[in-house]
Structure formats: structure tokens, C-alpha cells
Amino acid sequence: MAKEVAGKLRLQIRGGAANPSPPVGPALGSKGVNIMEFCKQFNAKTQDRIGKLLPVVVTYYVDKSFDFVIKNPPVAVQLLEIVKLKSGSAEPNRKKIAEITWEQVKAIAEYKMADLNCFSVEKAIQMVIGTAKSMGIHVKRDFSEKQLNS
């Protein structure tokens, strides 16, 4: 028999850096989840991704137990890593702060495909381009129609 789900909680935590202080502690503690056990398990599972911002979906049950799923870093974080900046443009429509190539966009889309709510790489690429535009990052489009479909 399956456990009865009490709820789900979404957090963004740096890999290997979960601790009981805010925002993790209060968010989990108010739901009755064992904070120290979560921190130990999360830090153990994210040893290979230390320092990266990781979205986590915590499912907590009526019996105070929990499960969690670690997703890939957000597209915005990956874009900022590629262009080596700390934040996007304050005026993305007027001021472009960086430029990325089509190959980099495609690589991010393929990497994030499992976490995005789309079924084709082309749609995932459009989502990545939209995120880049909203951050003031220009996508260099030096490709033919043949490359678009490959």
C-alpha cells in the first residue's frame, strides 16, 4: 500500500550546501519533515554538483517521512555560467550584455529536456532562447535551416 502524500514543496538549494538555517529549515520544519535527515541525504546526493543551484521537489507524507527529486539547474543559471556573469541585463530590450552560439543553446536545451514541459528539442530550444532574450543575452544565429532540424 502506498503512503498517503501530505504535500509537495519546491525549493532551490545549492548542491552540497543544505543546512537547517533559512530557507530550508523553516520550509521543511513547518511541514513536519526531519530537517537534519533531509540535509544529510541531499548533501550526499549532490556531492558531484557542489555550489550549483538545484531545484528540489520534496514530497512529504502523513507519517512525517519524505522523498525528494533533484532536477537540473535552471536555464537562467546555465546561461549565466556560459557567459560568465552574475546577473542578466537590467534592460534586456535595450542593453545586450552577452552573446551565445546556437550550439550552446542546443546543448542547454538537450540537457534540460527532462525537466521542461515540452516534447521536442525544437520547443526546448525556443524556451532557452526566450530565457536568454529576457536576460539580455543575444543568441548568435549563424545557421541554415538544415542545422535547425539536426
Curated annotation (Swiss-Prot):
Pfam families recorded: Ribosomal_L11, Ribosomal_L11_N
Cellular component aspect of the GO annotation: cytosolic large ribosomal subunit
Highest rank taxon of the organism: Bacteria
GO molecular function, one term: structural constituent of ribosome
PANTHER family cross-referenced by the UniProt entry: 60S RIBOSOMAL PROTEIN L12, LARGE RIBOSOMAL SUBUNIT PROTEIN UL11M
Record text on subunit structure and interactions: Part of the ribosomal stalk of the 50S ribosomal subunit. Interacts with L10 and the large rRNA to form the base of the stalk. L10 forms an elongated spine to which L12 dimers bind in a sequential fashion forming a multimeric L10(L12)X complex.
Identification of the protein by name: Large ribosomal subunit protein uL11
Species annotation: Azobacteroides pseudotrichonymphae genomovar. CFP2
Gene name of this polypeptide: rplK
